[in-house]
């Protein structure tokens, strides 16, 4: 039995390492492709630092850029970026093993275990079927999104260019990447040109939400449809938390940030800002015009991020929910963290605390370092680091002007936010002995 546990732990650890290595390899391939002269409009070789930053941002579905995507990169370069977004969003392991399965080869237990960790599935059983469902559903949703965006972009840009823009922005929105091609109007302008187009705003928001709620939630929705009582605890927590994190910030933005204009404009701007801030990185308004309280709220939302097993990064909605519920449990002087008539394991509570600690330390320390190196306001730099570690992509306009040191810090944060803090830690540390002896208990005062 002990031998079996050790073998299982070694396989478990190898899965984490394979996930990390696969992302590294994808970033390297993307960097080399973006360095090619054919990737830039000027047909010149792009520097390694610029190409790598773009590849990391695309693979980690972030959206922070040092070169405007529309005006600097050629059609080939944009296609490379889109490929990185698609594979990075779905997960390298998910795409790779799906191709292996399509070729007729069998997928063994080790591959299934790796796939399980890649999409944060609770068990190995049914993982191949779930992965196939994820990939098929993702492609269908992206195609539907492109078809819905096509009338807007084809009308503005012509049929050929409009179709390309529709496909690019549908995939970018669904994968929560935040890359856009509207630098043709003004560099780094994102979707500000369409701030009053309610139809386009709604389509983009729906794509962002769909990609950000997590693949496991899709599985429950696909299996149980409207019978919410049969959903897993994680799906219920994710859906509830996501709804709260959309509605409450939207109300703040509506009453305190967008307090001018028509009710329709204020409503759509508030909802769009609330949805995109946690995961996607598109913006339809000038973020620099927000006051400090609004900026601080956006920093918090970016740190929380999307949901487990989704295309988004950040601490994750489930982590935030577990931390909130554990705080309520302590205040009510209860022993068990409960939700929807279920008890949450102590392991999940401890993991949530560890994730919060790692994210806060990295986010704040990185912000302080960048602030000192670049001589910029701390809040501006914290906004940038939260955007990177949350793989969001929003910026107050400082990304392209940062030094090499600051860019490296942002790349590390983007990779950390996409792969996940626990994945990196588990891959680096030796597996724990499941037979650890328990030491004597002694109380310590906290709070």
Question: What spans do the regions from the language model cover?
Answer:
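Membrane-proximal intracellular helices of multi-pass ion channels
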Residues: 1-447
């Amino acid at each position: 039995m002990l031998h079996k546990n050790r073998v299982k732990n070694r396989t478990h650890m190898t899965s984490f390492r394979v996930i990390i290595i696969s992302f590294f390899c994808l970033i390297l391939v993307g960097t080399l492709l973006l360095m090619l002269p054919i990737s830039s409009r000027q047909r010149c070789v792009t520097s390694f630092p610029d190409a790598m930053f773009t590849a990391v941002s695309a693979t980690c579905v972030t959206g922070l850029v040092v070169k405007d995507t529309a005006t600097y990169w050629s059609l080939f370069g944009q296609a490379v970026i889109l490929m990185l977004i698609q594979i990075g969003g779905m997960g390298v392991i998910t795409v790779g093993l799906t191709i292996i399965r399509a070729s007729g080869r069998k997928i063994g237990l080790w591959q299934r275990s790796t796939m399980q960790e890649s999409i944060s599935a609770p068990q190995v059983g049914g993982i191949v079927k779930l992965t196939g469902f994820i990939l098929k559903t993702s492609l269908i949703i992206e195609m539907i999104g492109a078809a819905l965006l096509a009338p807007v972009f084809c009308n503005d840009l012509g049929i050929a260019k409009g179709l390309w823009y529709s496909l690019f922005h549908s995939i970018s929105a669904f994968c929560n990447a935040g890359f856009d091609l509207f630098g043709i109007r003004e560099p780094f302008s994102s979707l500000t040109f369409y701030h009053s187009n309610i139809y386009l705003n709604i389509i983009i928001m729906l794509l962002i939400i769909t990609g950000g709620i997590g693949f496991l939630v899709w599985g429950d929705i696909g299996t149980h449809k409207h019978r919410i009582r049969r959903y897993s605890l994680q799906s219920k927590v994710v859906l509830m938390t996501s709804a709260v994190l959309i509605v409450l910030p939207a109300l703040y933005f509506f009453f305190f940030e967008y307090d001018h204009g028509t009710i329709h404009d204020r409503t759509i701007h508030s909802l769009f800002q609330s949805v995109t801030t946690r995961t996607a990185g598109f913006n339809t308004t000038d973020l620099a015009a927000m006051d400090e309280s609004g900026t601080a709220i956006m920093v918090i939302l970016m740190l929380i991020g999307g949901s487990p097993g989704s295309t988004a990064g950040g601490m994750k909605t489930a982590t935030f929910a577990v931390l909130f519920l554990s705080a309520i449990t302590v205040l009510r002087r209860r022993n068990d963290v409960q939700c929807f008539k279920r008890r949450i394991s102590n392991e999940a509570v401890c993991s949530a605390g560890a994730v919060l600690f790692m994210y806060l330390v990295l986010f704040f320390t990185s912000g302080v370092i960048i602030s000192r190196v670049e001589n910029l306001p701390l809040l501006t730099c914290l906004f940038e680091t939260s955007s990177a570690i949350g793989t969001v992509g929003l910026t107050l306009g400082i990304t392209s002007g940062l030094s090499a040191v600051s860019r490296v810090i942002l790349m590390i944060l983007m990779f950390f936010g996409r792969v996940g803090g626990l994945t990196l830690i588990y891959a680096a540390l030796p597996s724990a002995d499941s037979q650890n002896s328990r030491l004597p208990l002694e109380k310590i005062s906290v709070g």
